[in-house]
C-alpha cells in the first residue's frame, strides 16, 4: 500500500511539474510575438522569420549535444522534417506580418481557430471519428473568429486574414509533427526543423537582396539592424527556443489532454503584454469572439477526452 501511494504521489508530482511548465509556456510565448512586433517597424518580416529559425538552431544545437541526442538527420525523415519546417515558416511569416499592424491578442484569437481546422482535417484526410457535437462546436468557434476578424478587417484590411493563414499552416504543421513524433525525440526534431527552415529562408533573403523587383524586393531584402533592433531579433530567437523547450518538457511530464486546454491561457498573457507594451486592449466585440473561440475549443477538448476514455474502456 505504501509503495502504491508513493507511485501515485510521484505521478501527481510529474503532472504538477508538467502543468507548471505549460504555464511557463503560456507566459513566455507571447514575448516572442512582442519582440517580433517591436522589430517589425525597421526589419522586414522575412528577416524576422529567418532570424527566429537561425537563432533557434544556434540555441538548440548545444542543448541537443548536452542531452546526447544524435544531431544527424535520418534520410527517411528528411522530407517530413523539411515539410514541417516549411509549414512553420508559413505560419510564422503570416503571424509576424499580421502583428506588425494588428494587436497581438486580436491576431492570436484568430489563430486559435487551428484546433477546429485540425478537427475537420482529421475527419476528411484520415477518416477520424468526429461527432456532430464537435463539428457544431467548430462551427460556433469559427463564428467567434469572424467576430474578431470583422472589426479587424475594417481597420487593417486583408492583413486581418493573415492569422487564418497561420492557423491553416499550423494545422498542417501539427499533422506532420504527429507523424514525426513517433519516430524521433522532440529536441532533435526542433533542431533539425530550425536548421532546415533556415536553409529554406536564406535563399529567399538572398534573392530579395539581389533582385530589383519593385514589389517583392522591399518585402524580402534584408537590412542591417540598427541599435535596439538587434535586441528584438535576439529576443525572437531566445523566446522561440524557450517556449518550445517549455512545451516539449511539459508534454514529457503531463498528458496532452491535461495540458491542451491550458493553451488558451496564452491569450491572457497576450492581452497583458499587448496592453503593457503597446497600449492595446481588445474591444467588446473582439472579447466576445475570444470567449466564443475559447469556450468552443475547451468543449472540443472535453469531447475528445470523453472519446478517449470510452475507447480505452472498450478495449
Protein language model regions, located:
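Transmembrane alpha-helices of multi-pass small-molecule transport proteins
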Residues: 2, 17-20, 43-90, 169-176, ...
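Membrane-interface helix-cap regions at the ends of transmembrane helices
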Residues: 7-9, 57-76, 145-155, 198-228
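Loop-to-transmembrane-helix transition segments
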Residues: 16-24, 64, 70-96, 158-164, ...
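Hydrophobic/small/kink-forming positions within alpha-helical transmembrane segments
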Residues: 26-31, 61, 85-93, 115-120, ...
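Transmembrane alpha-helical segments that form core, pore/gating elements
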Residues: 37, 45, 155-214, 218-224, ...
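Helix-helix packing/entry segments at the starts of transmembrane helices
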Residues: 51, 108-113, 180-196, 241-275
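C-terminal transmembrane-helix exit sites in multi-pass transporters
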Residues: 115-136, 268-287
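Hydrophobic transmembrane alpha-helices of multi-pass small-molecule transport proteins
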Residues: 133-150, 285-304
Amino acid at each position: 500500500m505504501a509503495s502504491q501511494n508513493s507511485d501515485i504521489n510521484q505521478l501527481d508530482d510529474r503532472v504538477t511539474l508538467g502543468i507548471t511548465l505549460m504555464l511557463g509556456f503560456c507566459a513566455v510565448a507571447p514575448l516572442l510575438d512582442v519582440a517580433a512586433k517591436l522589430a517589425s517597424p525597421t526589419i522586414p518580416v522575412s528577416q524576422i522569420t529567418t532570424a527566429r529559425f537561425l537563432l533557434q538552431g544556434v540555441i538548440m544545437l548545444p542543448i541537443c549535444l548536452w542531452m546526447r541526442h544524435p544531431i544527424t538527420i535520418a534520410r527517411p525523415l528528411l522530407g517530413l522534417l523539411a515539410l514541417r519546417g516549411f509549414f512553420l515558416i508559413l505560419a510564422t511569416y503570416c503571424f509576424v506580418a499580421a502583428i506588425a499592424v494588428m494587436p497581438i491578442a486580436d491576431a492570436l484569437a484568430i489563430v486559435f481557430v487551428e484546433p477546429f481546422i485540425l478537427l475537420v482535417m482529421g475527419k476528411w484526410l484520415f477518416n477520424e471519428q468526429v461527432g456532430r457535437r464537435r463539428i457544431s462546436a467548430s462551427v460556433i468557434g469559427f463564428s467567434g473568429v469572424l467576430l474578431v476578424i470583422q472589426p479587424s478587417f475594417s481597420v487593417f484590411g486583408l492583413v486581418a486574414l493573415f492569422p487564418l493563414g497561420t492557423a491553416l499552416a499550423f494545422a498542417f504543421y501539427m499533422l506532420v509533427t504527429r507523424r514525426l513524433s513517433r519516430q524521433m525525440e522532440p529536441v532533435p526534431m526542433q533542431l533539425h526543423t530550425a536548421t532546415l527552415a533556415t536553409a529554406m529562408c536564406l535563399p529567399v533573403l538572398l534573392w530579395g537582396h539581389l533582385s530589383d523587383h519593385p514589389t517583392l524586393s522591399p518585402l524580402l531584402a534584408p537590412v542591417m539592424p540598427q541599435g535596439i533592433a538587434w535586441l528584438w531579433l535576439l529576443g525572437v530567437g531566445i523566446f522561440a527556443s524557450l517556449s518550445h523547450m517549455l512545451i516539449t518538457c511539459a508534454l514529457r511530464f503531463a498528458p496532452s489532454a491535461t495540458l491542451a486546454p491550458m493553451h488558451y491561457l496564452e491569450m491572457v498573457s497576450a492581452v497583458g503584454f499587448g496592453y503593457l507594451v503597446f497600449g492595446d486592449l481588445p474591444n467588446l466585440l473582439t472579447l466576445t469572439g475570444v470567449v466564443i473561440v475559447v469556450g468552443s475549443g475547451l468543449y472540443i477538448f472535453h469531447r475528445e477526452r470523453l472519446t478517449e476514455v470510452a475507447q480505452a474502456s472498450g478495449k
